[in-house]
């Protein structure tokens, strides 16, 4: 299983803070996972943003990062502050 978490605006727009998805060989990268989520259509298109940030096992990474069974993935918009 892969634990997927959504933060900030993504959590609000998706009305979902996270979910567990079965891992498979087709989910070999964060990009493959993102494409599976985008295929849901509708609000899930928010994950198509160029500025999307992601983390694997609580470390920032790129969408090219490989996935493995048991990983935790987080998607979040860029962080700004003041």
Where are the regions a protein language model picked out?
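Ubiquitin-like/PB1-type beta-grasp interaction modules and other compact soluble beta-rich domains
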Residues: 1-81
